[in-house]
Every structure is written in structure tokens, then in C-alpha cells.
Design a protein with these regions (language model features):
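Bacterial signal peptide processing site
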Residues: 18-21
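N-terminal export signals and maturation junctions of secreted/periplasmic proteins
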Residues: 37-65, 69, 79-137
């Protein structure tokens, strides 16, 4: 579920879960030309030849040994097979360095400096918007079906996939098992989290008959068009094309899975995302987790520049426009977008990129918020 706000965009997709919740029944998938989709071969889960001892980069790693015991005792994996698998798994020191860089904190700036404008330019560009139009046109029927099934607008699904992977152009080239094993076994600060993700990764590989040594994604283990972490896969991924397998490198399954994610997070069908405000409120705390009554925001000097519907409360969002700040009323659907990545900039970019692609499809110039 890029992205890294608190850890990494898709990493903020959720905590680990050992079972998938029941999803609503899916309408029949329309017949399509299979040659238009990326091809993937499903093979029996093997991982590696059985081995009597753990060799390779994690040969003397007690965390790896404990993990093997955990998977054998809790999930019935064969110890010798896991030893053979991890003997072929590589420790990636550069992944640890990148994670440390993401965890570093830097002093904040004082006053507006254009932070939102710089962030927006990473995603909302003419070329990127046109690539989004091409993706939407190619998968229009799937996007419409996902919107009908889950109640999530097509532009939100398109915006997520665009921000996460440029509509499949940048899905990551790191072997997922290498990334997750490195962080689970040799990154103490987040070892428990990544051990849970590695557990879910091996479970989904076995369930979907995937070779865990073949799957590639981000340096933190995020997968496919929507950059789901394995725990997100377990909770939200769906077989949207009806072929009997869940494949997040397949854009159709990814579209349905992103839509299901938002539905499960509480997306309100037909509701507003956010509304710009006139005025300034420098004395108020800002962020998607704040909560104010509309009356309190009015008393602080803000006025909505559009309808707030029936909402009596809102978060107060602030975008750095360079010379000043632009304030927004953040509504529940905006908060839902931040569940994918805990960042005001991220959520606004997803929403505005999706809008820009939608407008470009219909021949309108993108709005400049």
C-alpha cells in the first residue's frame, strides 16, 4: 500500500495478520485478452532443495534459526526445506543503510518554503498524467467494476497506483525474500515487524504456489502495482480477475485489491475528500489526525470554499505553497487515504493525481491545488 512517510509508503499499509477477512462476492470478471496482461507462471511451492543445515549469509544467525522453528511449529513448514531456502537468501547491507536513512530525523524549517509544491511536482507532471490516462483507458472496465463492487472512485484507485508505481513502471527489482530476511534477522530496530512480514510472505507464497525466490518488489518488501506489504496481501488482496490466483503484479488483481483496501478502511461512497479554506490559522495545530468543529475553525478565521456536506467536524490540513500556507478541511475520506501512507502530502498527491488523470481523459486542464 511512494512512498516512505513513517517507514515507507506501502509499509504503512497495516500490521501483520494471519488470515484474510471475508471479502464481498465479486461480480464475474469480464472475458479479456490474456496476452494484454503480464504473464506469470504458478509453480508448486518449493523454495529450495532440503538442506540438513543452514548455510549462506544467515548460517550463524540465531534470529534466522528461531524463525525457522517458528514457521515449522506454527505453520507446518519443513525445517530442512526452510534451511535450503534461506541458504539461497542474501543479506542486503544496502537495505539496512536505506532504512537507517529513512529513520533519521532532521530539524524542521521555519515558515513556508514550498514543500508541497516540490512534492506535487514528483507526481503531477504532463508525462505522468498522460501515462495515467493510458492506464485508465486500458483498464477502464476493471476500474468501473472495482468502483461498483467496493464503492471507491476510479480516480482514487488510479491515484494510488500512480503514486506507488507509476502505473506499474516502477515496482521494484529487489528479491522480496532478501529484503525481508535482512530486515527480520539483522535490523533490530524493526526486526519483529519484518519477521511478521516474512512470515506472511512465506504463507502467501505457499498458498499461491509462488516461488519465494522469484518474487521481486521494493527494498522493504512491498509488492506489485499497489506496493502491498505481505500482511496487507493477507488482509486485503483479492482475485479480481477470477483466475483462481491472487497476483498483485497483475493490474486487474491490483485494482480490485486497492479498492478492497479502501472499503475495509472505511471509505464513504459519494462523500467529499477535502475542501480548501480561505483565511489563515497559524495558532492551530495541523495534520490529518487533528479534529476541530467547523464552528471552531470558523472562529479561528477560516471559511470553507466549498460545501462540507453534513460534516460538523474536520481535520485541519496545511499545504506549504512557498509564499504562504493553504489550509484545507480534511474529511473522513482524506483520513482513509492516509491509512495507505501516513502523510498529508501523500494523501493529497494521490487525490490530486487521480483528479488530474480524470480531467485529462475528459479534455480538461488539471487544477493547480
Amino acid at each position: 500500500m511512494r512512498r516512505i512517510a513513517s517507514l515507507l509508503p506501502a509499509l504503512c499499509l497495516l500490521s501483520a495478520c494471519s488470515s484474510k477477512p471475508v471479502s464481498p462476492p465479486l461480480p464475474p470478471a469480464p472475458q479479456s485478452n490474456a496476452s494484454s496482461l503480464p504473464q506469470k507462471t504458478y509453480v508448486p511451492w518449493q523454495g529450495a532443495q532440503a538442506s540438513g543445515a543452514l548455510t549462506g549469509d544467515f548460517a550463524n544467525n540465531p534470529n534466522a534459526q528461531r524463525f525457522i522453528e517458528r514457521m515449522a511449529n506454527e505453520h507446518g513448514f519443513d525445517r530442512r526445506q526452510l534451511q535450503g531456502l534461506f541458504a539461497q537468501t542474501e543479506r542486503l547491507d544496502w537495505v539496512i543503510r536505506l532504512m537507517d536513512q529513512q529513520a533519521a530525523t532532521y530539524p524542521g524549517s521555519y515558515g513556508p518554503n514550498g514543500a508541497w509544491l516540490r512534492y506535487r511536482k514528483k507526481f503531477i507532471t504532463p508525462d505522468n498524467v498522460q501515462n495515467g490516462v493510458a492506464f485508465w483507458n486500458q483498464y477502464d472496465a476493471d476500474l468501473q467494476r472495482a468502483s461498483r463492487t467496493y464503492g471507491v472512485p476510479e480516480e482514487i484507485i488510479v491515484g494510488i497506483i500512480g503514486v506507488e508505481t507509476r502505473w506499474g513502471r516502477v515496482m521494484g527489482k529487489t528479491r522480496i525474500i532478501d529484503a525481508l530476511a535482512t530486515l527480520a534477522f539483522d535490523y533490530p530496530r524493526r526486526a519483529d515487524y519484518f519477521a511478521d512480514e516474512l512470515e506472511q510472505f512465506l504463507l502467501l507464497s505457499r498458498k499461491e504456489n509462488d516461488n519465494p525466490l522469484a518474487l521481486r518488489g521494493s527494498y522493504a518488501g512491498a509488492m506489485g502495482y499497489g506496493q502491498f506489504m505481505p500482511s496487507s496481501f493477507a488482509k486485503y488482496a483479492v482475485d479480481f480477475d477470477g483466475d483462481g490466483h491472487i497476483d498483485l503484479w497483475n493490474p486487474r488483481d491490483a485494482i480490485g485489491s486497492v479498492a478492497n483496501y479502501f472499503k475495509q478502511q472505511g471509505w464513504r461512497t459519494g462523500d467529499i475528500v477535502a475542501v480548501p479554506a480561505s483565511g489563515q490559522a497559524p495558532s492551530l495545530d495541523v495534520g490529518f489526525e487533528t479534529q476541530y468543529s467547523i464552528a471552531a475553525l470558523s472562529s479561528a478565521g477560516l471559511r470553507p470554499q466549498g460545501s462540507l456536506g453534513n460534516h460538523a467536524n474536520a481535520s485541519l490540513l496545511r499545504l506549504d505553497m512557498g509564499r504562504n500556507y493553504q489550509y484545507w478541511y480534511g474529511l473522513p475520506n482524506f483520513y482513509v487515504i492516509t491509512r495507505y501512507n501516513h502523510s498529508t502530502h501523500y494523501a493529497m498527491a494521490v487525490w490530486k493525481l487521480g483528479e488530474a488523470v480524470d480531467q485529462a481523459r475528459h479534455g480538461y486542464a488539471a487544477k493547480g491545488n
